[in-house]
Amino acid sequence: SGTVMPTVSGAIAAIVGDRLLGRDVVCPLAPDTRIAAASAERVVDALIAVHDLPAAAFGHTRAMNLPSLSLTLAELADASARAAEGAGVRVGAMRWQPEPRFQLAVDQWPKRFESARASRAGIRADASADEIVAAYLRDNPRALA
């Protein structure tokens, strides 16, 4: 029947991590909830790129949004299922059970981040939910059931 995650970030992370371990997941958000997402791999690449930029590249501020992929939680769940299938392992079941307090919070989040400055520096977003899941698996080689 699955475990309800007590935090929003935990609920979103479980769509990939727990399901790839064969655990059933109950998500307190609707499947069509859209979020801005980035793999840890893309974030690390961005931090290295920013570190290597000359100070002049920043202009008057060093603040910069990192680009992200806009995706729905259903797209993330589907990508997890495809990754498990491709690896020949059982993916945990996915059940959607929206809770108004969580849904309201996430509905207020940005759905995408774009940054011309980041693009000029060669920093890019993940191309797809499948790319995010593949990066997760590279970072967590024992993440499959």
Question: What function would you assign to each model-found segment?
Answer:
Residues A37, S70, R112-F113:
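Short aromatic/basic micro-patch
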Residues D24, A55-A56, P141:
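Generic structural signal for secondary-structure transition and capping sites
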Residues A40, L69, L73, A125-A129:
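Amphipathic alpha-helical segment in the mid-to-C-terminal domain
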Residues P98, P110-R120, A127-A145:
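Amphipathic terminal alpha-helices
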Residues A13, A74-D78, R112:
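Short, surface-exposed alpha-helical segments at coil->helix boundaries
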